[in-house]
Amino acid sequence: MGDFASGLVAPTVRLGVTGLARSGKTVFITALVHNLIAGARLPFFDAAAQGRLLRAYLEPQPDEIVPRFPYEKHLGDLVAAPPRWPESTRRISQLRLTLEYASTKFWKRQLGQQRLHIDIVDYPGEWLLDLPLLRLSYREWSQTAIEQSQMADRKQAAKPWQASLGLVDPTDPADEAVAERFADLFKTYLREARADPYALSTLPPGRFLMPGDLAGSPALTFAPLDPGGRDSFPRGSLWTMMERRYEAYKSHVVRPFFRDHFARLDRQIVMIDVLAALNGGQPAVADLERAMTEIMECFRSGSNNLWSSLFAPRIDRIVLAATKADHLHHQSHDRLEAILTKLAGRAMARAEYSGAEVRVLAMAAVRATREGEAKRGGEVLPCIVGYPLAGETIGKRTFDGNEKFAIFPGDLPSDPALALKGWHTEHGEMRFVRFRPPNPVALPSGGFAPFPNIRLDRAIETLIGDRLA
């Protein structure tokens, strides 16, 4: 009832921001808040473009037990000399942004300026991939995890853990040292599979990759075991120890996250690094498609009525953002959107059928490149110009992070289905490198100018524009 009463004074939108590792969640939140507070030019965000957005400012968040999103620290990273990307999301955090605006509705204007609270909830997308575990027993999860680790795209990364499977007898007495060693091998496999060159996405349990405040906890000290055809195991065995911890993980980690945070969201943006999956080849793209389907199925989506909006909110607007659009020439942005639409197509259709609005955008919350041209032979190529991060490579060239380069990233396929069928492995000239942030521009009045972006205003309009009418 507290949320209900406060909502009568100043409405609140709970905006979920998620995505898999390195997809740009932290940068998106920092850029969104900075642009709104600084009064940036946002032509496709109606309230700002029409001069109705009067002020934006931060306020104390309502959930005092949830860590605050460190906006000031992350902004400091982006405006440092040289600028650097902020650290990735590793746990759930929250930030309250309040907007004061003039309504388009006559009766609201008679009441003076209006206020809208935006409670931004930042959480790792890896945690969403845990929700399907709620319907799996430990035995079912173990069998699934072992089968997945034997797939061609994971086999190499899983080799050390796979080797240890044959050395562990699930009927042996429970041993903490054995459990820790075996769990560490499993976690190492998941981390290897997530990193380049594999760039895989569907790697639960999510807290094994993003432990948050549970790092080192016994709740994260378990791993799949091979039952070896046995139907039951003795009490006090390694199997029953692992099974008990798996069930505790679901009860004390997964369910509270769903109940206390995820189930209360009104709007959602999902950040997806499609280009990283394309770099990883067809297996990584196929795995991203599986992850997108699982993530979208987790959302309690649909249109809201008065009752549901107050007591059982549904996510009625979803933005799927193909991030790092600045790593491509704008001529390929529509193709990037088409690939993401193809990846999430079935799940999008279900959400739209339930009444939710879903929009796909090629986006860069902070634009790290500009566009240019380069000649190769007699051909003029559309390029992007920026500072590749140290260690990034194209062919035999390794960048040091200090030099500006014009790079031709290639063209995405006109048929998005080709991206799911191994197209990238046949086009070796395609390589998407990462760039450092742009140099900040100091303002004479103090502070820094908002960073250039690609379609950030369209994302904001889709997520909250209707609430500012």
Regions found by a protein language model. Name each.
Residues 2-4, 9, 35-314, 329, ...:
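Switch- and interface-adjacent substructures of P-loop NTPase systems
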Residues 16-18, 270-273, 321-324:
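Conserved beta-strand segments of the P-loop GTPase G domain that flank and frequently precede/overlap
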Residues 347-353, 358, 363:
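Catalytic or ion-translocation cores adjacent to nucleophile or general acid/base/metal-coordination motifs
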Residues 32-37, 133-138, 285, 334-340, ...:
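Short secondary-structure boundary/capping segments
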Residues 266, 358-360, 377-390, 401:
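Class I S-adenosyl-L-methionine
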